[in-house]
Amino acid sequence: MTAKAQHYDVIRKPIITEKATLASENGAVVFEVAIDSNKPQIKEAVEALFGVKVKAVNTTITKGKTKRFRGTPGKRKDVKKAYVTLEEGNTIDVSTGL
């Protein structure tokens, strides 16, 4: 597997919500990442894929809700989010392609 493919395994997709938009005003971008990825892997992937310098990475894991499907209880998957703060002067435009 190439290095670029490994970076795409770490970063799944950008998260575009009201909270993520407010964070982008402070120079942060929010991504959904692989549940087993760590902060150095996320930093390396963002720097390699987008060509920017990363200042800090904060992560959070949201536990999946229990829902019912046709009467039987099921569970949604856990989601890990990464709040990536960029160095001054660096930007990532995640809204292109929408």
UniProtKB/Swiss-Prot annotation:
Coiled coil: none annotated. GO terms for cellular component: ribonucleoprotein complex; ribosome. GO terms for molecular function: rRNA binding; structural constituent of ribosome. Pfam families: Ribosomal_L23. SUPFAM superfamilies: Ribosomal proteins S24e, L23 and L15e (SSF54189). One of its GO terms (biological process) is translation. Keywords: Ribonucleoprotein, Ribosomal protein, RNA-binding, rRNA-binding. NCBIfam families: PRK05738.1-3, PRK05738.1-5, PRK05738.2-4. Belongs to the universal ribosomal protein uL23 family. Part of the 50S ribosomal subunit. Contacts protein L29, and trigger factor when it is bound to the ribosome. One of the early assembly proteins it binds 23S rRNA. One of the proteins that surrounds the polypeptide exit tunnel on the outside of the ribosome. Forms the main docking site for trigger factor binding to the ribosome. This is Large ribosomal subunit protein uL23.
